[in-house]
Amino acid sequence: MTKEMQTLALAPVGNLESYIRAANTWPMLTAEEEKELAEKLHYQGDLEAAKTLILSHLRFVVHVARNYAGYGLPQADLIQEGNIGLMKAVRRFNPEVGVRLVSFAVHWIKAEIHEYVLRNWRIVKVATTKAQRKLFFNLRKTKQRLGWFNQDEVEMVARELGVSSKDVREMESRMAAQDMTFDMSADDDASDSQPMAPVLYLQDKTSNFADGIEEDNWEDQAANKLTFAMEGLDERSQDIIRARWLDEDNKSTLQELADRYGVSAERVRQLEKNAMKKLRAAIEA
């Protein structure tokens, strides 16, 4: 991967709203334009052609990344990983196969995002309260199975989760509202610069959702392991992990941390990756 292509992959580290707006300004290619550019890259190694192919598909990566919003991971990071998958797809795309790039690239984009989620999900799971995890993901899983609830399904879900029908409707509305916010165009007043984490749907402190949740000793042990593992990191790595993963109210972007430490965003990403690797090893030990 060239330095220019790496720069493209790290594009969402700044303001997410501005990035999405910029991604949507790049015109989509016709089948003929796409084939011509792909041939230049495939047969001549034309990097300008590769750049155009990538830029014209950035909006598609944003679309794919939105499907992973429920994992509590920063949207900018999901998009960044998806962009890496897009670049791998562009590099491997054979224009003679007879399919559009978007059909070929979707598998690479999802593969990179899947790997990122699997690498980081356990840390997020430990760092979020048990009540938030159980409530959000149980309801989200049920919605994936049933879609938008009718009244009978609302009552069934309420029985399954041990809550009232009113609570189910309220949570469903919050989840739908957050999805609508992400769907808004860059020209709308609403800002989608904040990552869509489970805590955003669960900040109503009057909710009685947590009343019937069972104790989970493994999670308590994992939380203790995380605390112990954090103490083994250097001060800068601790700060990066806290700012990126543990501060639910004000998560920092890679660029913000890069400015704080006077290094590149790529360097912060490397430090974060190394720290996360150490934390995972400690939790899984």
From Swiss-Prot:
Predominant place of localization: cytoplasm
Pfam family of the protein (one): Sigma70_r2
One BP term from GO: DNA-templated transcription initiation
InterPro entries registered for this protein in UniProt: RNA_pol_sigma-70_dom, RNA_pol_sigma70, RNA_pol_sigma70_r1_2, RNA_pol_sigma70_r2, RNA_pol_sigma70_r4, RNA_pol_sigma_r2, RNA_pol_sigma_r3/r4-like, RNA_pol_sigma_RpoH_proteobac
Keyword Transcription regulation: yes
PROSITE patterns given in the database record: SIGMA70_1, SIGMA70_2
DNA-binding segment(s): 254-273
Region: Sigma-70 factor domain-2, residue numbers: 53-122
GO cellular component: cytoplasm
Transcription listed as a keyword: yes
Region (Sigma-70 factor domain-4): 229-281
Compartments in which it is found: Cytoplasm
Signal peptide as annotated in the record: none
Keywords linked to the UniProt accession: Cytoplasm, DNA-binding, Sigma factor, Stress response, Transcription, Transcription regulation
Gene Ontology MF, one: sigma factor activity
Motif Interaction with polymerase core subunit RpoC, residue numbers: 77-80
Protein function: Sigma factors are initiation factors that promote the attachment of RNA polymerase to specific initiation sites and are then released. This sigma factor is involved in regulation of expression of heat shock genes.
Subunit: Interacts with the RNA polymerase core enzyme.
Annotated family: Belongs to the sigma-70 factor family. RpoH subfamily.
Protein name: RNA polymerase sigma factor RpoH
Source organism of the structure: Enterobacter cloacae
